[in-house]
Amino acid sequence: VRLSIKRRRPALTRPAGTPLALEVSDLASVGSGTAARFLGRFALPALCAELDQAGVLPALRTRGYDPIVRIEIGESEHRLLVTASDGRELLIDLRMTEEALPVSEPALRARGIEVLSVLAVEWLSLQDPRAVFTRERPRLPGQTHPGLGLGRQLYSRVLGWAAGWGKDGLVNVPAYFHNAKFYAPPFAFLDSAEQGRFEALRRDLAGVPVAEASAALEAGRVVDAATSEPVTWSPGDMLAALSPPVREYLASPAYAGAVAAARDAQRFRLAEGAPA
């Protein structure tokens, strides 16, 4: 599955200008400062070791790629790029930030939690330029090439970083319905109303193949069952909770009840004439 996640926070995008691009051969010239480290922690050899241990680079080699890993470092956003050896075939594009996330959910604020310390995935693309789409693996919205099928391995490693660094959670905003469906759990929307809406969509589109359901949402062919108004996919933050207070909140009866109320209050369907 190709994961296509885009955080919709313009202030957090990589600033204009030439970023620092690093390869193994460049390390001698950049010194040992944090400017040369992905997320301020991983020099390129250490980052390659992380990807090796996660099974990401071995999987690419098995498919005939000789992967090259690069880092681009901006003021707030750090970017990990993996390409084929010729540099022309982009395989992995991961952009991340660390941030303090203001909390708006009343039930979470009532627990005294006003800001979350999170590791955030601003963008992630995993693609296999040499693969082809098939009936069994159809094109998903946002895809140029089929996915690598390495999303879980990479996310597991990133989640481990967030846990090891004492973060409250790992955050992303799923660009498409299929992203949210593939990564829940462990991810859930922090806003109980959003989680309820997502669960209602998942329930009512359960009989539709995920690629078709996601495409239908993008095309405005999913409608509110009561009003027949088109439904848009405009999600907020999904969080994989790590700290005990946030885990307890997402497992609480208050959160579950609010999610259930939002889910049960909504019904969706494909528009008349839309392919099922």
Residue ranges, per PLM feature:
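Context-gated lysine
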Residues: R2, K6-R9, R88, K167, ...
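Intrinsically disordered, low-complexity, charge-dense segments enriched in Lys/Arg
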Residues: R2-C48, Q53-L57, I68, Q195-A276
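A conserved beta-strand-loop-helix scaffold within acyl/acetyltransferase catalytic domains
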Residues: A49, Q53-R137, P185
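Mobile, glycine- and charge-enriched loop segments
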Residues: L81, S85, V103, I113-H145, ...
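Acyl-donor binding region in acyl/amide transferases
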Residues: R109-A188, A193-D204, P209
